[in-house]
Structure formats: structure tokens, C-alpha cells
Amino acid sequence: MKKTMTFHRKKIWMVFLVCALMLLGLVGRLVYLMGVRSDYYYQKAEELHERERAIKAARGQIMDAKGRVLADNKTVCTISVIHSQIKKPQKVIEILSKELGMDTDTVRKKVEKISSIERIKTNVEKSVGDVIRGYELDGVKVDEDYKRYYPYGSLASKVLGFTGGDNQGIIGLEVKYEEILKGQAGKILTTTDARGVEIDQLGESREDPVAGENLKISLDVDLQQYAQQAALKVMEEKQAARVSILLMNPQNGEIYVCVNVPEFDLNDPFTLNADVDTSGLNEQEKQDLLNQMWRNPCLNDTYEPGSTFKIITMSAGLEAGVVSVNDRFFCPGYKLVDDRRIHCARRTGHGSQSFVEGAQNSCNPVFIEVGLRLGVENYYHYFKKFGLLKKTGVDLPGEAGTIMHKMENMGNVELATVAFGQSFQITPIQLATTVSSLLNGGRRITPHFGVSILSSDGTSGRKLEYPVETGIISEKTSETVRGILEKVVSEGSGRNARIEGCTVGGKTATSQTLPRSANRYISSFLGFMPAEDPQILGICIIHDPQGVYYGGTIAAPVIKNIFEAVLERV
């Protein structure tokens, strides 16, 4: 009996001890939660009763060289609902469906969805948002937002680019300068009770957004409009596939004009141009067409430059001393290179001519001879030294690189064709940049649009700087090249670019596209003025013109007209 009582007493003590330990553990846990972790759980409790809504920042403007706004903001609204606060769901559904022009079932699903906040529609016109706000519907929020707006429509569309639904840059300058333009979003914090209803007495906590900075660019609206009209005119007259025009300062790299027609409407960038047939196309095929429409051929696409590239061969030959302006050549209408007969554009030949006359006549055999005198290794040396194997660094996304033979794969035939601008490909911006360095005394500048960054209120700003590489060629060679190219315009194949009272230099080009048997051409002209001290360099490239296709006949007059427009504005 005594043993049994002792056994029960032990069991009681064990139960008591276990309970005491459990109680002690609970007390310890409570102390830990209320003391050590109190801040953490206070924050969690706050989060349960706080609702956050983002306030988008006003995106920075993009302005042209004279301060005219090219990309601006338009006030729009975002319509949202808070399920727990809606008192009359059917009324909310009916009004939102009506005012937003949305399907009733779509709105119903969003309104009846149990979530802290549900977005109904974004980018709603402010006038519509004001009407909805006027209904004073419980649980319906109307927040003002921003949508990108482009006052000039399609002007410089492939340069400026556009933003998506979230107002972030997608292509062009909009994406290149995203970090500068986007600003910093703000937020609104509201406190709710356990049912999720906002507590009016506590109001709301607001953190204001910070507007993005403004970007000033070198592009000139007047010149861009003039050049775009000139490009459209020649595209229509020659029934060409597309036309590109580039105008820049060869001394500092500022780009004044960058036209690529057909352009597209920046305010409706996801709609293909009217002349594009989309019947029978699936969504991926339509997207591919959009991607093609958005491309900027001046820097995203490469082409065979043809005879405009003779400027590079000329400069390399003069710098290396393998040719002089007084050297004489004979052109029978072709040049034999190894076992290949390479023809001149003039099949009957130019006969005896000086190097300068060879440039005026755009004679292929003359430049083949200069290339052969240089040799593969030396020609490749200058090709690389002039910067043709690297990208220009232009401040737009997606710049394509040069497509060139590897030096070890180049023979005399490849060298001969490269010397007059065929069998390899570069971008128009690369050609313009390289020729600029050969005309300005040997400084390889960086082509660019961005000039300065300005604060949103215009009270402060900073100038953008770009790298410059010196010693590309000597000043003496540069001066000689300028003189030869002035003769090309005043007395040679570029005579259609002559301007009374102003010295113009330049080079024509007419190159066949692949396959050669298709008889399709790229006609172009590169010009600069004044010839003795170039301040403007321009290129016009016409793809697949019909009828007369010579660059000196159809592209040179376009640059002439644009140069005259520049002179009128000086």
C-alpha cells in the first residue's frame, strides 16, 4: 500500500514538473515575442492594416536642340477597386463598364475578386477618370498617372523610341536614357480596420514622386522635318523600298538629322503602317513586322557602302604614301586581279587619268590599284586604325558591327573588292563617323544625340561628354582628302550636289545588292560643307530605286537640297 502511494506521488510530481516546464517555456516565449521580437511583429501588424498604392513619377521630357519638346507626358488615370470597401457591387460594375467601355463580365470578375486592390484599367483619359470620381463610389479608386505623348507624331520615331504600358522605355533614346528619364515613384499609404475599410480619421501617408530629368538632344526639328519630307519625296519618285538620311557635325559628333522612311506613329507604335498587308498573318509574324518597323537602319542594319568607301581607300593610300595626287593610272574598263577580271562602272574605260581624276570619275581600277599597292596586311592595318572594326558608340541601342573578311582569309581579289566598297558591310553611322575623322584632321569622334541633362524644373543641368580618339591620320592627309572630294563635286560625278557660293565635297556610290543577278541597287551620296573646314556631313541612302539608280543622279540632289536648307537657317 505504501509503495503504491509513493508511486502515485512520483507521478504527480512528474506531471507537475512537466506542466511547470511548459508554463516556463510559454512565459519565456511570451517574453521573447513581446521584448526581443516586438518591433518585428509591430511592423507585421501595421502591414496587415496598411495598404500601399504607387504614384508614378512624371517622366523627363526629351527636347530638341532649340528646346522644343519631342517627348512629353499626358495625364491619364488608373481605375482600381478595393473589394472589402465596395458597398454596392452591382452599381460599381454597371458604371465602370459603361464609362470605361469594357465588357460587363470582365469588370464583374475584377470587382468580385477578393484582393487588397484590383486594377480595372490603366491609361484612362483624365476626363473619363474625373467622371468616375464624380460618382463617389465606395471602394473605387481613381489615381492620376502619366502616359507618354509625342507632339510630332512620326518625326524621328526610330531615334526617339517609345514607352510601354508601364511607361518604361522600349526602344530608342527612351530606353537608352531610361535611368535619367524615369524619375522615382512615390506611394500612398492608407490605414484600414480589420475588415479592410479605410479609417478616415487616420487619413493617409503620402510620399511624393520625384520627376525624371529632362534630356536635351542635338536633333533639330526643322531640319528633321525637311529631311523627312525630302526622303519621302525621293522614295515615292523612285518607288524605293526605303530611304535613310543622316546629318551630323564631323567636328564633334552631334547628330542633327536621322531619317528612316517609312517611319511610324510614336503615339500608336503597335499598329503597323497602313501599306502593310497583315491578312493571314499570325501573332508572331505580326510581331516580327513590328520589330522590323521599329529598326533604325542607320545603325541597326549593315550594307555594302560601294564607292563612298573609296574615301577610306584614298585616305589609307595617301597616309601610307603608296599614292599621290599626281600619280597617273590607265583604265581600259576593267582590272585583272589574279585570274579575275573586275569591271569599272564605265565598261569602255576612262583611259589615262590622274589619281584626282580617278576619284572624280569614281574609277574602280584606280582604287583597286591603290588597294593592291597597300597590300592585305597594310590595308587591314588602316581598316582597324580608322576604327572600322569597332562600333561607334552612338547613344542608341542595338548598333550593328562591321561584317568584314578575316585578314587571313583575304586574298588579292577580296582586297580589290573591299577597296571600292564591296564584299563587306558596315552601318551608315559607321561610315559617317569614319569619314568625319578623315575630314576633321584625324580625330575619331563619337556620334551622339544626347547633349545635356536638365533638372525637371530647369534650374540646373550638366553637359554630356563623349570620348575622342586622336591621331587617326595626319592633318596633311586630311587636307588632301578634302581637296580631292571637293573636286569630285565641283568637276566630277558629284556635280549634282554643287551649291552656288558654298564649297561642297562628297562622293557618290551605286552598289549592287546580293544576289548580283537580281539587279537591285543601293544608291547613295556622302557630302560635307564647307569643303575646306567641314561643319556638316550628310549621307542619303536609297534602297532599291526603280528606273535611274545612280547615286550621283538621285541621291546627291537630296543632300544638296538639305544643305541649302541648312544654309538658309545659319
Q: Could you tell me what each predicted segment is?
A:
Residues 1-278, 302, 377-389, 497-500, ...:
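Periplasmic/cell-envelope proteins involved in peptidoglycan metabolism and beta-lactam response
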Residues 71, 193-204, 251-308, 312-544, ...:
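Beta-lactam-recognizing serine transpeptidase/beta-lactamase-like catalytic domain environment
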